[in-house]
Amino acid sequence: MYTDKRNILQLASLLKAHNVRKIVLCPGIRNLPLTQTLANVPEFTCYPMTDERSAGFFALGLALHDGTPAAICCESGAATQCLHAVVSEAYRQKVQVVIISAGKDRLLLPTKKSVTLPEVKTEEDEQLCNRLINEALLELNHHGKGPVHINLCVNEPFLLLPVSDLPEVRVIRRYRGLSIYDQDYKPLIERLNRYQRRMVVVGQMNLIYLFDKRYTKLLYKQFAWIAENIGNRTIPGQPIKNIDPLLTSMNREEQEKMHPDLLITYGGRIVSDRLKRFLMKHPPTEHWHISPDGEAEDTFDALTTIVEMDPFEFLEKIANMIDSRTPDYPRQWETRAKSVPQAEFKWSEMSVIGNVISSLPPASTLLMANGSAVRYSQFFDVPKDVEVISCCGTGGADGTLAAALGYASVSTNLNFIVLGDLSFLCGMNALWSKNYGSNVRILLLNNGGGEIFHAQPGLTIDEGALPYVTGSHTRNAKSLAEDCGFIYLSASNEAELQSCLPQFVSMATGGKPVVLEAFTDATEDIEILKSYFRELKNPIY
């Protein structure tokens, strides 16, 4: 019989799946349900030992014997402190030892990977436990072997309740490249060819990669390709980019029909919340993440496989291994995406960004701050030879202007920096440094505060709280821009913007950088945006 505590059940199932079969068990009240459960798993060989220090070194010896991992289980707190010496020895000898502790304490040892599992009260808690355990056990043998530490929060009651079977759990596997000498990857390719509904989603990538034409022809029609502008040109063909309007225009039945069976991802952050909700609500059977560092990026709570290699090398390697038949799935996505009309907005932040993007000169760089600037750019087609950069890895307004100026200072292109008023106000000290040249163009979107706060579904902000929630203000950038040597332009309507754009996108500015400040109304911006999405749900076209 096993405990009913789901973090322990997840751990037991994943220890078995990751071939951790030798476990040294130390007595203790807090780890009682854990010890009883592990001792009852028939696939485990368990060794009782009272002294934690001795138990740790005993586990080290077990792991040294045949090179397979061994585990030591004890209470947290003082008992875990006794294991510092064995952790140090295992780390230096690169031996796979799993330290498992249970208690209220969140003490973590300095191992290759240390995680704390919460008590499971919701499905989200259980999903988190599953991912953390997988990450820790994968790290036992990743860029060298070594110890890991898994700490469980275990609270009373400690009774062993009658759970007769371990649960079926998600097991994340890692392939280190696609070399037959490192790991047999044939089952991976067999699974790839088994699925007909295959999708590739590309996250943020600060580069341009041009695929050989032979690979483009082999790959493009085999997958539905989805990317945001911050993914740049890193796809063998033209991806679907109008993902937010497209998903909004789909009803529930259509979304269910269009979800992928196999999802492959590469690159960094994905900004679209609608895309994330779609893939979490309709999860793929398998999610493969391809990255050179082999990290477990579980963006959609569906990760099953990590392939540790350059994503472009991966795609070019599988190109000749994919069955030659062309599935209908990519064509369905492409046709559906083309059915959504091009977005058109009256005067607003969206229309300003659209006008600037359509006016970008060849071989320029578009540097977007986090959040709204990135989302709104997705409504428009960025020219193919324009590189897109954004500080959206962690989120937040801090440092976006300084990072963009740093990039522009060593770039020979015209650099168009798009950011909101709060991002500008947070980072305006960077303008005093003068570590930039005449190739800087700043599009400042000023709607008197944080527009994104008005966009939250169901949120009503009363007048008294408005300055605190949205950072509302009445400032403009004219004096600061001119003091710092910028040409200052401003627009409060479409006609004024059109008169400013030729100078804003020109190289001939007398050796000066340029700020274009566009004034809009936050409430109107959001109403225009919401009206657009309402129309997509109830189309009149």
Regions found by a protein language model. Give the residues of each.
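Glycine-rich, acidic loop regions that bind phosphate or pyrophosphate groups
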Residues: A90, I100-A136, A227-E334, K434-N435, ...
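Conformationally flexible catalytic loops at phosphate/diphosphate-handling active centers
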Residues: Y2-T3, L132-E135, E139-R194
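N-terminal cofactor/phosphate-binding cores enriched in small/glycine residues
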Residues: T3-C73, A79-S88
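Thiamine diphosphate
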Residues: N40, I100, L107-K113, F379-Y541
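Active-site diphosphate/adenylate-binding microenvironment
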Residues: I8-N19, C26-R30, L34-A39, Q332-T412, ...
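Phosphate/pyrophosphate-binding active-site segments
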Residues: M1-Y2, K121-E124, F278-S372, K478-L480, ...
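A short, small-residue-rich loop immediately preceding and capping a beta-strand
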Residues: R21-V24, T45-Y47, H65-A102, H259-G267, ...
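Glycine-rich, anion-gripping cofactor-binding loops and their flanking helix/strand elements
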Residues: L64, E75-S76, C82, V202-W288, ...
